[in-house]
A protein has these predicted regions:
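Type-3 copper protein
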Residues: 1-286, 302, 309-311, 342, ...
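Generic recognition of stable, solvent-exposed alpha-helical segments in well-folded globular domains
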Residues: 255-258, 262, 303, 318-322, ...
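Short, flexible loop/turn elements at secondary-structure junctions
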Residues: 267, 271, 289-291, 312-314, ...
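Catalytic zinc-binding patch centered on the HExxH motif and its immediate surroundings
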Residues: 286-305
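Post-HEXXH active-site segment of zinc metalloproteases
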Residues: 300-303, 313-322, 330-361, 497-501, ...
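Post-HExxH zinc-binding segment in Zn-dependent metallohydrolases
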Residues: 336, 347-387
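Long, C-terminal catalytic modules of enzymes
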Residues: 358, 378-392, 401-412
Length: 624
C-alpha cells in the first residue's frame, strides 16, 4: 500500500543549524532565520510522528471506527490548496503532545483502564486535526470525530460542547459535514438532529466555544497569543481525560487580556530582545488556576514547543518575566530537536530553582531560562520604585548568582557536546557582563541568605553521608577525639522523591521586601507555637531580624522534631547573623553531616554543639 500522506508539502529534507544560531540563541536573540529553522524542524518532526502513528494504527486498530487513512486523505486535500494551514496544524502544540502519547500507546501492549479512552478514540485526534483543516480551508467533505466527555475538539479553532451527556460506555462518534464555500454552514451530525456551526468560528454561539486570541503586543505584526482552554492535550501529558472543564469566563478572559497587554507594553518598551523572542516562539498559553503570591505556576514540555502552562500572576512584571522564562524553555526545546547539546549519562546535581536533584539537561534548561529572568530584573529594577524596586533588585541578585554558579558546573561537566560547550560558553559570557552591576545592600544581603538557604535545604533533603564514615565520625566524637583529627565524611546523592518545591523562606523574604506589613501579620498569627508547624514562627523571627530569638526557636524545634529539614538550614542562617561562624558554616555547608552526627550522638541535645564540632572537622572533597 502506498502511503497516503507522502505528498504533504512539509519537506522532510536535511535541517542544518549554523553556529551563528547557537551564538544568537545563547544571547537571547531569536533572529528570523533561527525562528524559521526552529519551526521547520518542529513541522518535520511532527510529520514523521504522524507517519508513525498512521502506520502503527493500521496494524494495531485496523477495524476501529476511525481509520487513520481517511484523516490523512483529508489533510492531503487541505494541503494541496492551503499548505500554510497544514503547517500550522503541525506546529500546534497539541499535535506534538498527542503524537508522542499515542505512539507510546501504540507501541505498548498494556491496556489502560477507564477513564483513559480506547486506543481508536485517541488515534481519532488525527481526524480532529483534519476536520479543523477542512473548516479553515473551506475544503468540503465529511469526517467522523470522537467525542470525549461531551466535547468535540477542533484543534486551533475551539470545541463543540454537545447538549446532552452520552450514556456511559465507550466514547461516542459524531460526523462533521463541511460544505463547499457559500453553500451553508458546517453541520455536526449527532444522531438525532444536526448542530450548525457558526460561519464565524472566532465567536461563540450555542454549543460552539472558540479559542480566545489576545493581541498582547503593541506591534500589529506580532501574532496574538492563543489562550488554550479547549484542546484535550493542552495539559501536556494528561491526555484526553477530564476535558469537560468549563471554558474561560468573560471576566477571566478580560483579566488575561488586560495583564497580557500591560506585559507586552513593558516588554517592548524596556526588553525588546525578549519581546522579539516571545513573538517568534511563544504562541499558546494554557491557563492554570490562580497560584499564591510569589509562586506563579508555569511549565513547558519538550514536545509542545511554542506552548506554556501558567497561572495569571498579580502584576504585569510577574507575567512578563514568566513569559520570558517559558519562551526560553521553548527556544531551547526547539534547539535540542535540531542538535544534541548533552550526551552520555547525566548525574543528578543541585539546581537553585528546584527542590529536587536535576540531570545535566535540567541544569542547562534552568540556566538558560533563568538567565532570561535575571536579565529581565536587571533592567526592570531601574524602572520601579521603593518596595517594588527592592524586590526587583533581590530577584536580579538571586538569579544572577544562581545562573553563574550553574554555568560554572556545566562548563566543567563531561557531558556537553561540542555544540553544547559552545552554547554554554556564549551564555556564560553573556551572564558575566552582569557581575559588576551594583545591588543595594539590603536586597543583596537577603539574596545571599536566599542562595545559602536553598543550597543548605537541598543538601539536607538529598545528600546522605556515607554510613560507615558517619559511624566512624560518631565514634570519634563519643570518644572525645579532637575534631581536627576526625575522619572525613563524604556525602552521596540520595534523592528524596517527595521534595521538589524549594523551601518557603524564599516567599517570606519576598514578602519582607514587597509587603512588610503582611509579614508582621503572619508573625503575630504564628505567635510562639512549637511543633511541626513551628518552623514558620522561627523563620519569621529570623526574617524580622530577631536572630538570637530565632536561634532559640530553632533549637527548641530541632530538639523535638529533628526531621524538620528546613530548620537545620534556618538555624545556620540565624547563627550566622549572630556571629557564630564555625557552627553556622557547618549547618550551611554540610548540614547533612551535622544532622547525621546529631542523630547518632546527641538526639534531643543541642544541635549547635554538634554543628560546632562538625565545623572543626576536616571537610571531604565534594562528590555530589
Amino acid at each position: 500500500m502506498t502511503e497516503p500522506h507522502a505528498d504533504i508539502r512539509t519537506v522532510l529534507g536535511r535541517h542544518r543549524t549554523p553556529a551563528s544560531d547557537l551564538d544568537d540563541l545563547a544571547a537571547g536573540r531569536v533572529t528570523p532565520g533561527a525562528a524559521r529553522r526552529i519551526w521547520a524542524v518542529e513541522r518535520s518532526r511532527r510529520l514523521l510522528m504522524l507517519r508513525a502513528v498512521t502506520d502503527l494504527a493500521r496494524r494495531r486498530v485496523p477495524a476501529g471506527p476511525l481509520p487513520p487513512d481517511s484523516a490523512m486523505d483529508l489533510l492531503l486535500r487541505v494541503d494541496r490548496v492551503r499548505p500554510d494551514i497544514v503547517a500550522e496544524l503541525l506546529e500546534h502544540p497539541g499535535t506534538g503532545v498527542w503524537a508522542v502519547r499515542t505512539l507510546e500507546r501504540l507501541n505498548s501492549a498494556e491496556r489502560l483502564p477507564a477513564p483513559v479512552p480506547p486506543l481508536w478514540a485517541e488515534v481519532g485526534y488525527l481526524h480532529c486535526l483534519a476536520a479543523a483543516g477542512a473548516l479553515r480551508s473551506g475544503i468540503g467533505g465529511t469526517i467522523r470525530l470522537p467525542v470525549h466527555d461531551t466535547l468535540v475538539t477542533l484543534p486551533t479553532l475551539g470545541r463543540v460542547r454537545l447538549p446532552r451527556t452520552p450514556p456511559p460506555g465507550p466514547p461516542a462518534l459524531v460526523t462533521l459535514r463541511v460544505p463547499a464555500p457559500g453553500t451553508g454552514p458546517a453541520l455536526l451530525l449527532t444522531g438525532d438532529r444536526p448542530l450548525a456551526l457558526p460561519a464565524d468560528l472566532r465567536r461563540p454561539r450555542g454549543p460552539w466555544e472558540p479559542l480566545h486570541r489576545i493581541a498582547w503586543s503593541p506591534r500589529p505584526q506580532d501574532p496574538p497569543f492563543t489562550l488554550e482552554d479547549a484542546d484535550p492535550y493542552r495539559g501536556f501529558r494528561a491526555g484526553p481525560t477530564a476535558t469537560a472543564a468549563p471554558a474561560l469566563t468573560g471576566p477571566e478572559t478580560r483579566g488575561w487580556h488586560l495583564l497580557l497587554r500591560a506585559a507586552g507594553d513593558l516588554l517592548h518598551t524596556r526588553h525588546p530582545r525578549a519581546a522579539k523572542m516571545l513573538a517568534e516562539t511563544l504562541r499558546v498559553l494554557v491557563p492554570l488556576p490562580t497560584a499564591p503570591r510569589f509562586r506563579t505556576a508555569s511549565a513547558s514540555y519538550n514536545e509542545a514547543v511554542g506552548s506554556a502552562l501558567l497561572s495569571l500572576p498579580r502584576t504585569a512584571q510577574d507575567l512578563a518575566v514568566t513569559l520570558v522564562h517559558e519562551a526560553r524553555h521553548s527556544v531551547l526545546n526547539g534547539l535540542l530537536h535540531q542538535l544534541a547539546l548533552i550526551e552520555g549519562e547525566e548525574p543528578l546535581l543541585y539546581a537553585p530553582w528546584r527542590g529536587d536533584p536535576r540531570p545535566l539537561s535540567g541544569l542547562l534548561h534552568g540556566a538558560y531560562a533563568f538567565a532570561g529572568v535575571a536579565d529581565f530584573w536587571r533592567v526592570e529594577r531601574h524602572a520601579l520604585r521603593e518596595r517594588a524596586a527592592e524586590l526587583a533588585h533581590f530577584e536580579f541578585a538571586v538569579w544572577r548568582t544562581a545562573v553563574s554558579e550553574t554555568l560554572a558546573v556545566l562548563l566543567t561537566a563531561p557531558g556537553l557536546t561540542d555544540a553544547g560547550r559552545l552554547f554554554v560558553t556564549r551564555l556564560t559570557a553573556e551572564a558575566a557582563t552582569w557581575d559588576q552591576e551594583p545591588v543595594p545592600a539590603r536586597p543583596a544581603a537577603l539574596a545571599r541568605a536566599e542562595l545559602a538557604d536553598l543550597r543548605a535545604v537541598w543538601r539536607v533533603r538529598h545528600l546522605r553521608p556515607d554510613p560507615d564514615l558517619a559511624d566512624a565520625l560518631a565514634a570519634a566524637r563519643r570518644g572525645g577525639a579532637d575534631p581536627r583529627t576526625a575522619p572525613t565524611v563524604r556525602s552521596l546523592t540520595r534523592p528524596d522523591p517527595g521534595a521538589v518545591v524549594p523551601d518557603p523562606r524564599g516567599e517570606l523574604r519576598r514578602l519582607l521586601l514587597a509587603d512588610p506589613d503582611a509579614l508582621d501579620r503572619q508573625a503575630r498569627a504564628a505567635g510562639s507555637a512549637v511543633g511541626p508547624g513551628a518552623p514558620v514562627a522561627a523563620d519569621l523571627l529570623l526574617l524580622r531580624g530577631a536572630a538570637a530569638e530565632a536561634v532559640d526557636a530553632y533549637r527548641t524545634l530541632l530538639a523535638e522534631h529533628p526531621e524538620a529539614v528546613s530548620a537545620w538550614a534556618g538555624l545556620g542562617l540565624a547563627l550566622r547573623e549572630t556571629g557564630v561562624r564555625t557552627a553556622s558554616a557547618a549547618l550551611l555547608e554540610r548540614p547533612e553531616v551535622v544532622r547525621a552526627l546529631h542523630a547518632r550522638t546527641a538526639p534531643g541535645g543541642d544541635p549547635v554543639e554538634t554543628a560546632d564540632w562538625v565545623g572543626r572537622t576536616p571537610r571531604a572533597p565534594e562528590q555530589v
